[in-house]
């Protein structure tokens, strides 16, 4: 017996669009929406991070603590500074997942940039690239420091969550920045060597850790020169 049930209406514009769509087009999902309530469940670096331009290169310092909702210490040995280029390093500030994703994405883009152009990326171009990704990507409130060395000299940049890029001789980001800035500005001198800058940075991180619940448990130092990036972790007592 013939089925007389009417089939779907194929005459409307919506139906036409469905049948005319490219069968080979990728199916693009939506970016996940994150709320303030969700952020309470996210591992965050809390953090105090410092970048100092020196006569030798750049020194970057961070504490080691990660927290949940700013109240519970979830990890006491987080490396919050990573090599992003053979002569540049970037700190992790904000949600751990967002910062790690940001670094992976930026590394890939730097490799692509250099492969296409056949030359090393400049720190100015790298900072611009980082700012563009911070503004346009789903990296959830990151605020890193970029420090690097190129043919034009030694450079330190702070990158805000909206993609703003600011260059300075030294900078601080993270939850302990107000305390760290006080110590850093008191001890900073122009044309410091990397060794001198390490001591100043360590003292500034320790001062922040005394008052900021999101910072503490030791320090990672990145020594950035034209020869490369060297990153090591220390207890405060080893440096001060």
Curated annotation (Swiss-Prot):
* UniProt similarity note: Belongs to the peptidase T1B family.
Q: One Pfam family from the UniProt entry?
A: Proteasome
Propeptide residues according to the Swiss-Prot or TrEMBL record = 1-46
Identify the coding gene.
psmB1
Task: Give the GO molecular function terms.
Answer: threonine-type endopeptidase activity
Name the HAMAP family on file: Proteasome_B_A
GO BP annotations, alphabetical order = proteasomal protein catabolic process
Q: Where is this region: Disordered?
A: 1-48
- Compartment(s) where it occurs, according to its Swiss-Prot or TrEMBL record: Cytoplasm
Q: What is this protein called?
A: Proteasome subunit beta 1
Assembly? The 20S proteasome core is composed of 14 alpha and 14 beta subunits that assemble into four stacked heptameric rings, resulting in a barrel-shaped structure. The two inner rings, each composed of seven catalytic beta subunits, are sandwiched by two outer rings, each composed of seven alpha subunits. The catalytic chamber with the active sites is on the inside of the barrel. Has a gated structure, the ends of the cylinder being occluded by the N-termini of the alpha-subunits. Is capped at one or both ends by the proteasome regulatory ATPase, PAN.
Q: Which PANTHER family match?
A: ATP-DEPENDENT PROTEASE SUBUNIT HSLV (PTHR32194:SF0), METALLOPROTEASE TLDD (PTHR32194)
What regulates the activity here? The formation of the proteasomal ATPase PAN-20S proteasome complex, via the docking of the C-termini of PAN into the intersubunit pockets in the alpha-rings, triggers opening of the gate for substrate entry. Interconversion between the open-gate and close-gate conformations leads to a dynamic regulation of the 20S proteasome proteolysis activity.
